[in-house]
Amino acid sequence: IRDSVQGVGFRPHVYRLAVRHGLKGFVRNTESGVEIHVEGKPGAPERFFAALMDTLPEHARVYGVEQTVCEPAGFEEFRIVESDSTPGGVPMMLPDLAPCPECLKEMRDPASRRYHYPFTNCTHCGPRYSIIEEMPYDRAGTSMKKFQMCPECLREYRDVEDRRFHAQPIGCPSCGPSMKVLFSDGSELGFGHGFDTPAEQVAWVLA
């Protein structure tokens, strides 16, 4: 499947659908899009593909599909596997996506561990184009490779029911990028000045 299918939660969506249809095989990113290999009972792959095309993630755009019938390889489960970086076309890179309602809710919730965290994101939103260094789109090919996930972020990343399942830019105040405002002399403007958010700090400096 080619074009805008990386960085939109496509692989997690494929994984859930494949498991729901009782299929075995894998899904992985490639240089030109996403490769899916499915094996199952007669009719199951066709039903899976129809469901996939009917329920694409919000920001996914499919412009080309190539289907091949092959002999079963005997996979025992369905997995998201390591990307294939073999040259094979030019994929479409997504622009950065505005925070989704769920992420905004977390950022505004004092009980959330991402309260006021400006880099909150998930598979439905957050940075894409601005952090990509190479394709396929994997954390190791983005500027986020410098930030090792904390145990809690890693748990979300591995949880198939979590909206951050395989979200490549995932992070939090404990393990992700941070932001600070510096004066021209190098001194830092801290929250002690009566500001609750980085945005309020910046607005005060620019006023």
Residue ranges of predicted features:
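Intrinsically disordered, low-complexity, mixed-charge
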Residues: 1-180, 189-196, 203-204
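Gly/serine-rich nucleotide phosphate-binding loop at the start of the catalytic core
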Residues: 185
